A protein has these predicted regions:
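Bacterial N-terminal signal peptides
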Residues: 15-29
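Conserved polar/disulfide-associated segments of primarily extracytoplasmic proteins
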Residues: 35, 39, 60-159
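Short, solvent-exposed loop/hinge segments that bridge or flank secondary-structure elements
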Residues: 66-71, 571-610, 643
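Short, well-ordered beta-strand elements
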Residues: 79-82, 146-159, 509-512, 516-526, ...
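Central antiparallel beta-sheet cores of small beta-barrel/beta-sandwich binding domains
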Residues: 82-85, 90-118, 593-639
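Short, gly/Ser/Thr-rich active-site loops of penicillin-recognizing serine hydrolases
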Residues: 105, 173-201, 523-593, 647-666
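Short, conserved catalytic-motif segment at the N-terminal edge
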Residues: 193-252, 272-274, 281-282, 288, ...
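Short, surface-exposed loop or secondary-structure junction motifs
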Residues: 226, 230-237, 290-504, 508-512
Length: 666
């Protein structure tokens, strides 16, 4: 996120998407990993031709003819691995669906190329329409090795996919061709990132930025305690001339979590708090919707993505403007675990926001929760690290040198995102509401690389206290785990720590390799830059280790994916909303948790207005004939589905594990 992570689990952040068996946390040379308990690994398996995969714990494996079928513990959700003799990807996928389900593939929504990775080349990803009224994720990946095809089919209930992301990661990244040997940097020394290598990085960045239509990108690279590059590419706002640079402020979204847990680590070192302090002890009155979970919940459980609490964003996204910090605890009081403590990686935002506010309350109990958090972050993090430009104040940030948020409209053009959308983050700011820049975040990455020492050599935090946050709390995939607001990936044989961030129209990532003294911060002002959260660190590894060239393939596949996605949206959606669809809408709807939705019409345009923001909507006919509405720019990740109930007309909004019904109101 997980991405983080980070705010939308359907497109997980950076290397959180790595999949595979989670080996014992003691694997690899990192001493800090050796001290942690190892999450359970899965069971190795093979297809008939010897392509390897790992079956996650509690999943079952069966054969349906030529298909190896893996079933999730909940039942009704499957992954199928099918070898196929075919001339192309589409034929291979058709054969695979027949072998798995005895029928042709479902109606196709989109087909896009896949980047070459893990020994597979020339792959394609097929995305399908789910049946009416059945929230499912249906897709097929046609992968090729040695001229032969193998297909992975995902046939998953949306709720299962939401809570089993780490298991899906485990299956996916462990799935490699027979005889494939994974690339490893273990025991290797990184090369100096000299002027020639930096020039190659800059060329890659500018070419990629243009290919992906990212208006502005800022980056900083550090090696062995020295900043070897800092700068910007492009502009702060599409169509304008003001450039971005290393001082430009971006909304860093979930990267804020890592800064929040640094503040908590400082409080632990001061003796004000323990990671195992019960939350209800630190903040009397704290409660979840489940009494047993409330009693078990410790400070670390709020920031480990390991407490079984599901993704839940819409409560605060649809809240009134300028909602107080206390809204976080109102949301948590409605939440209950959907998996046991420590059983499943579930990346979610309200608990992490609560962690920051609890820390602020412990430090400054006399202040309002939000003010206390802001003060704790200023005194424990921003001031000591000299992060002078980093702020939670949107008004202060959005003056002068800052990057405007951009998305893609239904017409396929880059467009500004309404800033009111991202301002909703202020109420839950410990989980994702900081504005920062390359220079300030390099100071933070330097602290992590220096084991808790500031750039002038002074001790900020004992190394053990700093690295407590690095220790595994829950498996996220192959040799990968989530700690306390930080991800770690050991798949390359050397630890890579990171966290990503994503909000409407903003993307960010910070990554460091502690064994090699290398770190990078990359910030972007467009949703179209997703792949660069992964591809930029990959490019650095190619330059530092002469690694296999994959970064360019990643960007090329992502650019093709973006073009196909835009074309599909133009084809499927009518913007503004089609007249007949709009005419069937009620003037006003209400949901008891998300509040009021008003339908406004002006000059042929239809807008949905909520408590703090509004958006123009497009419409289409979905599966089974239901009319669906979506924001024309920066929509919630799932459409509003029109329907009827005994109470009148309805609009239903579903995320992975939650359903919200807006009902016609007088």
């Amino acid at each position: 996120m997980s991405q983080t992570a980070s705010f939308f689990p359907f497109a997980l952040l950076f290397k959180r998407c790595l999949l595979g068996v989670f080996l014992a946390c003691a694997a690899g040379p990192a001493a800090w990993a050796q001290t942690a308990a190892a999450p359970a690994s899965g069971t190795p398996g093979q297809t008939p031709s010897g392509h390897g995969f790992v079956l996650p714990k509690d999943w079952t494996q069966t054969r349906r003819g030529d298909a190896v079928v893996l079933q999730a513990p909940e039942g009704g959700s499957w992954i199928a691995l099918v070898e196929a003799e075919a001339g192309d990807a589409a034929q291979a996928v058709a054969q695979a669906w027949t072998a798995y389900a005895g029928r042709p593939p479902p109606p196709l929504r989109l087909a896009v190329p896949l980047a070459n990775a893990n020994g597979w080349v020339g792959g394609h990803h097929f995305l399908y329409r789910a049946p009416a009224g059945e929230p499912r994720q249906l897709s097929a990946r046609a992968l090729r090795s040695g001229g032969r095809w193998v297909v992975r089919i995902d046939d998953l209930a949306a709720a299962v996919a939401g809570k089993r992301q780490a298991d899906l990661n485990l299956i996916g990244d462990s799935f490699v061709p027979a005889g494939h040997v994974r690339e490893s940097f273990a025991g290797r020394k990184a090369q100096t990132l000299d002027a020639g290598k930096i020039e190659a990085l800059k060329t890659f960045l500018e070419r990629s930025r243009r290919s992906l239509e990212v208006p502005g990108l800022s980056i900083g690279v550090i090696q062995d305690g020295q900043v070897v590059y800092r700068g910007g590419f492009g502009v702060r706002e599409h169509g304008k001339r003001a450039p971005v640079d290393a001082d430009t402020l971006y909304l860093i979204a979930s990267n804020t979590k890592s800064l929040t847990t640094l503040m908590l680590a400082k409080l632990v070192d001061e003796g004000r708090l323990r990671w195992d302090t019960p939350v209800a002890e630190a903040l009397p009155g704290f409660e979840l919707a489940d009494a047993d979970a409330t009693a078990k919940m410790q400070i670390r459980h709020l920031v480990c993505a390991c407490a079984g609490l599901p993704y839940r964003n819409l409560d605060w996204e649809f809240a009134p403007a300028n909602s107080p910090a206390s809204i976080v605890f109102d949301i948590l009081a409605r939440m209950r675990p959907t998996s046991a403590f420590g059983a499943s990686y579930q990346y979610t935002n309200p608990p992490a926001a609560a962690a920051g506010y609890v820390g602020g309350h412990v430090a400054y109990p006399e202040l309002e929760l939000g003010a206390a958090y802001d003060r704790a972050m200023a005194t424990r993090v921003f001031e000591p690290l000299r992060m002078a430009r980093t702020t939670f104040d949107f008004d202060r940030a959005m003056r002068g040198n800052f990057a405007r948020s951009h998305g893609v409209g239904i017409d396929g053009r880059i467009a500004l995102v309404d800033p009111r959308r991202d301002r909703q983050m202020h109420a839950v700011r410990p989980t994702g509401g900081a504005w920062s820049n390359v220079d300030d975040l390099l100071a933070y990455v330097s602290l992590e690389l220096n084991g808790g020492r500031l750039s002038d050599g002074r001790r900020y935090l004992p190394e053990a206290a700093l690295r407590e946050r690095w220790k595994p709390q829950i498996a996220t995939g192959r040799d990968a785990w989530y700690g306390l607001g930080l991800d770690t990936d050991m798949a390359s044989g050397t630890p890579m720590l990171f966290h990503g961030g994503r909000l409407y129209g903003q993307r960010s990532n910070m990554v460091w390799w502690p064994e090699h003294g290398i770190g990078v911060v990359v910030l972007m002002n467009s949703s179209t830059g997703n792949v660069l959260m992964d591809a930029v660190p990959r490019k650095l590894m190619e330059l530092a280790f002469d690694a296999q060239p994959e970064a360019d393939s990643m960007v090329a596949a992502a650019a093709a994916n973006e073009r196909a996605t835009r074309e599909a949206r133009r084809r499927d959606w009518g913007a503004p909303a089609r007249r007949g669809h709009a005419a069937a809408l009620a003037p006003r709807y209400r949901n008891e948790l998300l509040g009021e939705l008003r339908v406004e019409r002006s000059r042929g345009e239809v807008r949905f207005r909520f408590a703090a923001w509004d958006m123009p909507v497009a419409s289409r006919v979905g599966a089974g004939g239901a009319v669906e509405f979506s924001g024309a720019i920066a929509s919630p990740p799932y459409p509003f589905v029109a329907g009827r109930s005994a109470a009148g007309r309805t609009l239903t909004l579903r995320d992975a594990q939650n359903e919200y019904v807006f009902t016609e109101a007088p």
